[in-house]
Amino acid sequence: MQFIDQAIIDVKAGSGGDGISAFRREKYVPAGGPAGGDGGQGGNVVLEADDNLQTLLDFKFQKLISAENGQRGGPNKCTGASGKDTVLKVPCGTEVRHLSTNIILGDLTNKGQQLIVAFGGKGGFGNARYLSNSNRAPEKFTEGKVGEEWSLQLELKLLAEVGIIGLPNAGKSTLISVLSSARPKIADYPFTTLIPNLGVVRRPSGDGTVFADIPGLISGASKGIGLGHDFLRHIERTKVLLHLIDSASTDPINDFKTINEELTSYGHGLISRPRIFVLNKKELLNEHEIKKLLNKIEKLTMKKVHIISAVTKFGLDDLLSSIWYELGY
């Protein structure tokens, strides 16, 4: 499935129906009064969060979304039918902005949550509305109001409590695959993961916690280099970051510093987000090398650093215990 996490759409609410000018015409009522009905309300355009959707792909080619117009009024003071609302399903985690002003209209995070993004126009008045003591036979009526029309930007930010970050080939996809039932593409070269992978990891209580493997973080990612700028937004909602370091890389210390710099540059409070530091690929180093590297990383972080092997599953139970503790479970 192609992963689309941004889309621009045009929405147009329905216009209100026109009121009409009509008079009561009955056999024994020679001076029937005004009886023109009001127009119906235009339909709204509504977005609704749906947890069965994972991408904004449906909006890639669906550019204009409109709602029904209200119907014109009828005789005998009959109000025209209101236009039907158009309800669009979007993934949970979709943020909606006005394209021209960048103002956030809403953030659809919960299943079934709705947001009206374009209001339908009000129906016009029929001439029955203008009856007065001074005018017993008004002919005046009004047209319906035009429905709202906007260009919107939809931006999907994944709803995961734990975000797994690190340079390409640090072992993020392998880790999420052994902790959960997720089956991401895994290979021994950088940029295997081109879309965020989600996996549900079971807590001791049996409840699930969503983990996200965030791809594409390289030096300059926060400035749009590589894939990182597109995916950094997906860790904005996370509660805990799992910072994975490839202990067998050419320069693990520099790798650690690179990710730190990108989190700082991107902003949005990511650098101050609770973080658990993890040295992965223990199986590729001897005990002396691991201990030496561990000491260096702990001096930089001033925190405990976990040593794991996602391949052999060494240290995963201890790592999970730390994650549950940080999340308050």
UniProtKB/Swiss-Prot annotation:
Instruction: List, for all copies, the residue spans of the domain called OBG-type G.
Output: 160-328
Q: Which UniProt keywords apply?
A: ATP-binding, Cytoplasm, GTP-binding, Hydrolase, Magnesium, Metal-binding, Nucleotide-binding
Give me the residues that bind ATP, please: 166-173, 191-195, 213-216, 280-283, 309-311
Task: Give the top-level enzyme category.
Answer: hydrolase
Known Gene3D superfamilies for this protein? GTP1/OBG domain, P-loop containing nucleotide triphosphate hydrolases
Residues given in the record as Mg(2+) binding sites? S173, T193
MF term (GO), any: ATP binding
Q: Where in the cell is it found?
A: Cytoplasm
Q: Does the record bear Ion transport in its keywords?
A: no
Annotated ranges, domain Obg: 1-159
| Top-level taxon | Bacteria
Extract the Pfam families matched here: GTP1_OBG, MMR_HSR1
Cellular component terms per the entry's GO annotation: cytoplasm
For this protein, the record's InterPro entries field holds: G_OBG (IPR031167), GTP-bd (IPR006073), GTP-bd_Obg/CgtA (IPR014100), GTP1_OBG_dom (IPR006169), GTP1_OBG_dom_sf (IPR036726), OBG_GTPase (IPR045086), P-loop_NTPase (IPR027417)
Cofactors, names only: Mg(2+)
EC number(s) per entry: 3.6.5.-
What is an annotated GO biological process for this record, any one?
A: ribosome biogenesis
Fill in the subunit field for this protein.
Monomer.
| Function according to Swiss-Prot or TrEMBL | An essential GTPase which binds GTP, GDP and possibly (p)ppGpp with moderate affinity, with high nucleotide exchange rates and a fairly low GTP hydrolysis rate. Plays a role in control of the cell cycle, stress response, ribosome biogenesis and in those bacteria that undergo differentiation, in morphogenesis control.
Q: Which family does it belong to?
A: Belongs to the TRAFAC class OBG-HflX-like GTPase superfamily. OBG GTPase family.
This chain's protein is named GTPase Obg
